[in-house]
């Protein structure tokens, strides 16, 4: 069993409509409409790097960079939590949201990644 099936990135924006148009028209990203004007964009394969933080450094550097929440996606959150528990990882409680089931996946540093089982259409495989 794969522990994750993809990555879901949330970008916060003061002008979501403009950013959605940019993603669609400028970056040519395909999307799935999950209702209410919410678009989820397909992304190419991803990679992740771990960067150390310096005391007092902002969480993101560069003009306009305000950070992001990263969620690893899975097909079955309970089965994934059980598989992680066998590896010594204790996830937080599962919360039911209108968009899926979510929990926190703790990292050794004390930070955490989101882990969720989507209940909405996904944009995976649209690239």
Which residues does each predicted region cover?
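Vicinal oxygen chelate
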Residues: 1-2, 5-14, 39-42, 59-127
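Conserved active-site alpha-helix within GNAT-family acetyltransferase domains
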Residues: 17-26, 103, 112
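Conserved short beta-strand elements that form part of the metal-binding/catalytic scaffold
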Residues: 29-65, 106, 112-119
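N-terminal beta-strand motif that seeds the catalytic metal site of vicinal oxygen chelate
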Residues: 1-20, 47, 68-70, 119-127
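Short beta->alpha connector loops
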Residues: 55, 76, 96-98
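Residues that act as N-cap/strand-start positions at coil-to-secondary-structure junctions
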Residues: 25, 35, 66, 97-99
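Short secondary-structure junctions
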Residues: 27-33, 89-94
